[in-house]
Amino acid sequence: MSRISQIELDDRNLPPPTPEIEQERKVAIFDLIEENSFVLPKRDERDVPEGPYHLSLSIREKRLVFDVQTEGGDKAAEFHLSLSPFRQVVKDYYQICESYFTAVKTLPPSQIETIDMARRGIHNEGSRVLQERLEGKAEVDTDTARRLFTLICVLHFGG
């Protein structure tokens, strides 16, 4: 099974993330590197270099860019996804995360759990959208899609 062995976020033009967002990002990257599934399918009858891969995620000209290289530094693939299908779910996820971070500081556990369930539901929706958008470009499992979606949110909202 092919996988991502290294990930880089091109966040040079983003404001510094809040401590909560930075923590979410660190956890997503750590978990992604520890366990993921990332397969590049054959395209146009051409073989694709085998992984593991180094993945660079960035936003260029309002498009999400996946730049995939082999561990040896050779280009394996590059694909650009429109951000439009992600806009609403990213916005919803960002808002529920803000509510969650506030709730953790002030609300009882039962109310935090309710917000966390909603957060997980929106996160699942975002990972589903990502899997659909990657169809034919890369195959990822649900956990990998969830972690990548977290990183997309960081890039999309500028930290």
UniProtKB/Swiss-Prot annotation:
Keyword Ligase listed: no
Domain of life of the native organism: Bacteria
InterPro entries per record: UCP032146
Pfam families (alphabetical): UPF0262
Residue span of region Disordered: 1-21
UniProtKB keywords: Plasmid
Similarity comment: Belongs to the UPF0262 family.
UniProt-recorded name of the protein: UPF0262 protein TM1040_3562
Organism: Ruegeria sp. (strain TM1040)
